[in-house]
Amino acid sequence: MNAPLGGIWLWLPLLLTWLSPEVSSSWWYMRATGGSSRVMCDNVPGLVSRQRQLCHRNPDVMRAIGLGVAEWTAECQHQFRQHRWNCNTLDRDHSLFGRVLLRSSRESAFVYAISSAGVVFAITRACSQGELKSCSCDPKKKGSSRDNKGTFDWGGCSDNIDYGIKFARAFVDAKERQGKDARALMNLHNNRAGRKAVKRFLKQECKCHGVSGSCTLRTCWLAMADFRKTGDYLWKKYSGAIQVVMNQDGTGFTVANKRFKKPTKNDLVYFENSPDYCIRDRDAGSLGTAGRVCNLTSRGMDSCEVMCCGRGYDTSRVTRMTKCECKFHWCCAVRCQDCLEALDVHTCKAPKSADWAAPT
């Protein structure tokens, strides 16, 4: 009763959807999916009909979103680089992060926010670079206007962030809008907070025209800030995320602790406390911290005491090539020697229990 090989590939997306944890944003897997737009749209597991429809109609936008996935996951990993959970991704899992996001935790709140922000950023940038058929520069930024420095003319290419937000809302929120449960409402709230974060750092840039740079005339445009600003802002929101519970009629949230203020549209919200991420735990989706590099002199989250959860650490001596004895040569170059540097690297010990290395 061996199935033909072609039949196995035909059913593989369905099997992945059935066997994998139910995480709403399976579109994250678009990072790893290549080929034609039809192959991509039909073989990313878990997309709802509205998402597939948008995917088929806008293959150029989907390419931009797919490229953006790598960017926002890298930003997530940068923000969590010194923490026990370091936003690690699983290449073989269509949810990208595995079971860790099944919990309605602070980490889930951050990932949904940064991913939604990443879609806005990727689409808006692609619009300005002329890569999309459906949008270009912001058409509303025309003619003259005023600011606190006087009159200026709109020129150049203003980032069309309203289009990016509109498409991101339609595509990213599509699955959550089909459900009325608490997790769907949590995801929608954090998705919106992520989109708003990108727009928060839209800035006006100007170029002066006139004799000797006198700036008698100014041409201005709106541009998104580097995505790092959005990541830093959402990290602060993660640190101050508000724990909530559903209200009695199931239409919104109320704070879990009455001493805290009601969350705004810019805040991140979560329902469940996070696991400690110390040990590998299949159910929690935690990979643990065994083998993670720690900082012996730090007192923060990256310290060996905190990162290793009190288990201790191993120290190894390694060498690396660095630039040294750099000298400035007129004009205008800096020349350096290549030197070998020896340093100690500290890594967290594994738990003593025999089952810590069980695969997740």
UniProtKB/Swiss-Prot annotation:
Family the entry assigns: Belongs to the Wnt family.
A GO-annotated cellular component: extracellular space
Posttranslational mods: Palmitoleoylation is required for efficient binding to frizzled receptors. Depalmitoleoylation leads to Wnt signaling pathway inhibition.
Species for this entry: Carollia perspicillata
GO molecular function: cytokine activity; frizzled binding
General function of this protein: Ligand for members of the frizzled family of seven transmembrane receptors. Probable developmental protein. May be a signaling molecule which affects the development of discrete regions of tissues. Is likely to signal over only few cell diameters.
Full protein name: Protein Wnt-2
InterPro entries: Wnt, Wnt2, Wnt_C, Wnt_CS
Compartment list: Secreted, Extracellular space, Extracellular matrix
Disulfide pairings: C76-C87, C127-C135, C137-C157, C206-C220, C208-C215, C278-C309, C294-C304, C308-C348, C324-C339, C326-C336, C331-C332
Taxonomic superkingdom: Eukaryota
Keywords linked to the UniProt accession: Developmental protein, Disulfide bond, Extracellular matrix, Glycoprotein, Lipoprotein, Secreted, Signal, Wnt signaling pathway
Lipid-substituted positions (O-palmitoleoyl serine): S212
Keyword check for Signal: yes
Signal peptide interval: 1-25
Gene Ontology process terms (BP): animal organ development; canonical Wnt signaling pathway; cell fate commitment; neuron differentiation
Residues that carry a glycan: N295
PANTHER family, per the entry: PROTEIN WNT-2, WNT RELATED
Pfam families: wnt (PF00110)
